[in-house]
Amino acid sequence: MKWVWALLLLAALGSGRAERDCRVSSFRVKENFDKARFSGTWYAMAKKDPEGLFLQDNIVAEFSVDETGQMSATAKGRVRLLNNWDVCADMVGTFTDTEDPAKFKMKYWGVASFLQKGNDDHWIVDTDYDTYAVQYSCRLLNLDGTCADSYSFVFSRDPNGLPPEAQKIVRQRQEELCLARQYRLIVHNGYCDGRSERNLL
């Protein structure tokens, strides 16, 4: 009888793993993503950090779509250099379309040379366009198809945060990305609002 319970336990564990496929190729993205509706100002509320030096808090991104339909973005935020020097810095990104309207290749660079630059996948996992958005990027795959170096942002249209119903959806998307409890909250305290030139890069 013990072996029956052992088989049942293994089956339960197996089904649990099946429900949570952490291969990047299995992750869902926003269906019929609309770049025009997504454009405008987004405030980063939470972030799963990658390797390297990126904007750390007070992050505000502005997405736009030109007359040819190409999406681009600028972002401003605080960066700490040498463990004790806080500056506000800008990053710029341009997006190349793929066959999936919610999956882009994003070429990005910092206006200041110390910030990261690269050409990463940029996926819009989910958004309602008016309240929340979840972005995901995997920069390096493991041999088993899971991600070795990823980053992800939770965005809000409101700098004061997300309403409870949106928070619930976001938590579900974080689980689906196998990134639950790996995000840190992003502060918005006005540090980069109207800073003097000596604090801007």
UniProtKB/Swiss-Prot annotation:
Cell compartments where the protein resides: Secreted
Gene3D superfamilies: 2.40.128.20
Annotated positions binding substrate: Q116
Modified residues (Omega-N-methylarginine): R139
Alphabetical list of InterPro entries matching this protein: Calycin, Lipocalin_ApoD, Lipocalin_CS, Lipocln_cytosolic_FA-bd_dom, Retinol-bd/Purpurin
Gene Ontology BP annotations: cardiac muscle tissue development; detection of light stimulus involved in visual perception; embryonic organ morphogenesis; embryonic retina morphogenesis in camera-type eye; embryonic skeletal system development; eye development; female genitalia morphogenesis; gluconeogenesis
Main function: Retinol-binding protein that mediates retinol transport in blood plasma. Delivers retinol from the liver stores to the peripheral tissues. Transfers the bound all-trans retinol to STRA6, that then facilitates retinol transport across the cell membrane.
Name of this chain's protein: Retinol-binding protein 4
Organism: Homo sapiens
Lineage of the species this protein comes from: Eukaryota, Metazoa, Chordata, Craniata, Vertebrata
Gene: RBP4
